[in-house]
């Protein structure tokens, strides 16, 4: 088991459930369950809130789980250096049009040395490279 960083789409899919309670995207849910730590950047949490829209109960449940010290979730606030690095990623990989949230996911991955990303955005995170020389690829889950 290794830690992962949850991107917006990956987290939304991992949490999606059918009316009977079973996972809509079981491979995403399994990646969350198998992780030693699920790092959720605060900007990702804000984006998840936006996409959940009127599903307030789902957001309340997610926040409660993130704040529960007995879960594997870790809320990761963006440091000033993360925001600056996110803008560097956005400029370096301009054709991807990463934006601040995806750039911050990459910056947190780089700072925390956690290279496993739970995401639906294979195009951007598959092309992105982190590290001082932009040499390190990310491992995309599931």
What are these regions (language model features)?
Residues 12, 46-49, 87:
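Amphipathic alpha-helical segments within well-ordered protein domains
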Residues 37, 72-74, 139:
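Conserved beta-strand segments of alpha/beta enzyme cores
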Residues 4-7, 40-41, 98-100, 121, ...:
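Histidine- and aromatic-rich ligand-binding microenvironments
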Residues 43, 47-78:
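Active-site-proximal, substrate-binding regions of enzyme catalytic domains
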Residues 1-40, 52-64, 131:
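Short, well-structured N-terminal submotif of metal-dependent ribonuclease cores
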Residues 1, 111-142:
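Acidic, PIN/NYN-like endoribonuclease modules and their adjacent C-terminal/linker elements
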Residues 74-120:
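Active-site neighborhoods of divalent-metal-dependent phosphate/nucleic-acid chemistry enzymes
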